[in-house]
């Protein structure tokens, strides 16, 4: 019983939010899939910088679900931002109360951007507070670490691309 409780501590909390285009996303329904959850905001400059990397992950790995969870933006702001910055993955929004609860449930999101990778078992396997940038990888190794965790979680080689 104690072991089951410890195992369940690593499971990610459930939430349901909508994307600006009206599609609903529920974490429980995504169990069995690999999810990259990115907490961010339109006013956050480092968040904007990592959009090409997140677009790349979204387009390269068919079985990876990339979700941008805005901590403060409205549906209209996300729609405009998505078009302006050519964001390829879903951008989710909620009330400040919903976002605060999700942030705390996920261990406290104290900086944006923060990326969390969730494996097929619904467990966090990677978390990083800061921008995941390919250009900084030679100094911080974050991009390559996340890429390795994605391919491990998906059970694919790095070259596995969407057709």
Task: Identify the role of each PLM range.
Residues 149-163:
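Non-globular targeting/processing and membrane-anchoring segments
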Residues 48-86, 96-103:
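Structural microenvironment flanking redox-active thiols in thiol-disulfide oxidoreductases
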Residues 30-33, 63, 87-88:
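Active-site acidic short loop of glycosyltransferases
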Residues 14-35:
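A short beta-strand-turn-helix
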Residues 84-87, 94-149:
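Thiol/disulfide oxidoreductase modules built on the thioredoxin-like
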Residues 1-14, 80:
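N-proximal helix/coil linker or "cap" segments that precede and/or mark the start of modular domains
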Residues 31-32, 39-56:
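Conserved redox-active cysteine motifs that mediate thiol-disulfide chemistry
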Residues 36-37, 66, 115:
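Hydrophobic beta-strand anchors of alpha/beta hydrolase catalytic cores
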């Amino acid at each position: 019983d104690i072991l089951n409780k410890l195992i369940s501590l690593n499971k990610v909390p459930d939430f349901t939010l909508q994307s600006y285009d009206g599609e609903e996303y529920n974490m429980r329904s995504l169990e069995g899939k690999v999810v990259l959850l990115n907490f961010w905001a339109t006013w956050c400059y480092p968040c904007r910088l990592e959009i090409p990397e997140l677009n790349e992950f979204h387009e390269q790995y068919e079985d990876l679900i990339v979700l941008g969870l805005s901590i403060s933006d409205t549906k209209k702001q996300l729609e405009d931002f998505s078009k302006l910055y050519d964001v390829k993955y879903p951008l989710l929004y909620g009330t400040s109360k919903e976002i605060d609860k999700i942030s705390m449930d996920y261990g406290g999101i104290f900086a944006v951007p923060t990326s969390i990778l969730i494996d097929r078992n619904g467990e966090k396997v990677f978390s990083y507070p800061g921008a995941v940038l390919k250009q900084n990888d030679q100094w911080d190794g974050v991009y390559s670490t996340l890429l390795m965790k994605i391919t491990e979680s998906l059970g694919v080689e790095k070259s596995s691309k969407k057709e």
